């Protein structure tokens, strides 16, 4: 993240993986989960107590490598803003693939600041 050291957080990692799995296994691409819930709900459900939370998602075979997805996020103003936002101090990220789904590869980054 663009403002200095950001550390990994297990709760954010769990929320990220859960959302990537949900999108891949239920064949959709959205910040809203198949249960209608938001990133904040997913982070809380994963045991993360937050004061600020945000999310980047990406999907598609053209984004199958870490370098490709990071390049896409940096090239997108909204996604890049999340990457550079100074109020986020922790991160969790995941990638999940399901060849039977429309996009095949699904990425989720969850950013947070603990309360």
Language model: regions and residue ranges:
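Short, well-ordered surface patches within globular domains
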Residues: 1-46, 86-91, 96, 100
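A well-ordered secondary-structure block
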Residues: 38-115
């Amino acid at each position: 993240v663009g403002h200095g050291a950001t550390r990994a957080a297990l709760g954010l990692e769990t929320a990220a993986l859960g959302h990537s799995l949900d999108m891949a296994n239920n064949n959709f691409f959205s910040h809203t989960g198949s249960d209608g819930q938001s990133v904040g709900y997913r982070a809380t459900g994963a045991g993360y107590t937050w004061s600020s939370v945000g999310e980047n998602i990406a999907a598609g075979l053209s984004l199958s490598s870490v370098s490709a997805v990071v390049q896409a996020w940096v090239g997108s103003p909204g996604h890049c803003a999340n990457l550079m936002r100074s109020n986020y101090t922790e991160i969790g990220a995941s990638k999940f693939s399901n060849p039977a789904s429309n996009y095949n590869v699904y990425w989720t980054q969850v950013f947070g600041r603990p309360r």
